Amino acid sequence: MSSAIEALFEERRRFPPSPEFASQANATGELYEQAERDYAAFWAGWARKLEWSKPFTETLEWNEPFARWFGDGELNVAVNCLDRHVRCGKGEKIAYYFEGEPGDRRTLTYRELLEDVNRFANGLRKLGIGKGDRVAIYMPMIPELPVAMLACARIGAAHSVIFGGFSPESIVDRVNDASCVALITADFGWRRGNKVPLKRNCDIAMEQTPTIAHCIVARRVGDDVFMHETRDIWWSELVAGESTECEPEAMNAEALLFLLYTSGTTAKPKGIKHTAAGYLTQAAMTHELVFDLKAAHDIYWCTADIGWVTGHSYIVYGPLANGASSVLYEGTPDFPDKDRFWEIVERYGVTILYTAPTAIRTFMKWGTEYPAKHDLSSLRLLGTVGEPINPEAWIWYREWIGANTTPVVDTWWQTETGGIMIAPLPGVTTLLPGSATRPLPGIGVDIVNDRGESVPLGGGGYVVLTHPWPGMLRGIWGDDERYVQTYWSKVPHRYFAGDGARRDADGNYWFMGRIDDVMNVSGHRISTTEIESALVDHPRVAEAAACGKLDEMTGQAVYAFVSLKGGLGGTPEFADELRDHVASKLGKFTRPKYVTFTQELPKTRSGKIMRRLLRDIAEGRTLGDTTTLADSSIVHELAERAKAEVAQEE
């Protein structure tokens, strides 16, 4: 860490809640006051909304940096997501509207989901899998994925979901780190009309995973795959004849619910540990309040992949704990055409939509004719997740998807936090385009400088969390020392989030991206997010990414990669126009030295811009691992263009 990050961009537009929305909102301003008085008691109140087989009497045990929440209580997560809803007469309520990429559709009621989970849980027990085991899951976005997760939770096994876009090597790393005893997969998945060979990837991986005794395979596509005689079993055969009842395992509140690995592109992946009760409490509370969920009639859709934490918390555990009806979509936003998302919103009458800024910027680039084809009037609340959203994308989202009326909740959180940490409470919070606004009730946040001192309002710096929260990670699997070093060693007694932000005069948080997405230009520390927001503010720019390039004169120079609306190419004259535009918005020292135009920015399959690769391209370095890219051909083309751009400027 060096000096605090300079905050340059000021957004003045404000959207207070409408009286109509506020009058029916789940949240009230009193929640902040309750949490301020006693945050542990506040969280205990939310935990008591869950069903406990043994109620807790101890709320928080804090031995920094290790927390135990509700530690003497017992519950079962699957019971809280399924059984209790069926018991109270909601068994016929739809849990999931499933839409496959090829257009096949299924609905699953809470009763059907419970029966499927119980059959599969019984099948797992028959294989000898049970309490304390770890089970890897590598599946497409089909209903069998949440079924597998909940079946593990029912019998007390911890799941480790591996994103279906990862390579066999990534499967090996994750399976071996946790000594998983079983691997659950599918024959294939669908992606843009192509068959993704999931089972084949698992076969390659299992040559190097000695702890895997069983591989369970769901049929998604139906094509032939290799089946090992003693190891592999079809899902359908495993559950055939199994009972639709399964006794749930009573689990301690602090029992491991799942592992989720953060990306291992530069180091060994970190197995983030989340435990049953605290995680479920925060997932359910945040889902109810941040999305203003009315479970009786809302149709909720989080477009993430379950392979990422957003899918765990806001497709599976939060919505099911709250008895919500959700859309589960297998495919991409542009297959078979660029209006697929809006077709789905219209078909199911989606009322709450939660997606990523990258997707929104892509929709902007494609143009408004695609959402305009469909009736989106069912939507009443929009959310964003995954990275900071620039104000223009926020405004576009509200205007073209939300009919200029819906609240837009920009949410900040991490794999490590388990649930949303900073976000508006719709009906309470005045919304600011580009700001996640305030920490949620019960969450302690501060911004500090490089000496660990709190930065006054109006200043920028490093985001830290000031006290424990229920959904927090309980460590890194098998590596307590790495947990302490990564998150607790940089600022005394504070969780170091690794993100930069500024806090305005009203206490609202404006995120500026990861700290490694900060440039030092002539002694000024500038967030790449602010540069990108200024670029996207230009009416012809659809998407932009910025990074620093080493520079003899200024330490670092700003390098901008720009994608234009309508897929148009850029000219040297327009590059100069963009340089002037950024300088006028943020100051002359922020003027990009290099501007490279591209049809597409390199992104992971989850839609995040691969900034590490852009830094490599800018510096002319050998490109690192590209296996997580959605389209690796983009990178090599971009590297050639960048080489020419640098040669021209120098």
Enumerate the predicted regions with their spans.
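Conserved pre-ATP/AMP-binding loop-to-beta segment of ANL
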Residues: 92-94, 215-217, 228-261, 268, ...
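Gly/Ser/Thr-rich phosphate-binding loop
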Residues: 317, 321-324, 351-355, 364-431, ...
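Conserved ATP/PPi-binding loop(s) of AMP-dependent carboxylate-activating enzymes
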Residues: 438-442, 453-487, 526, 622-623
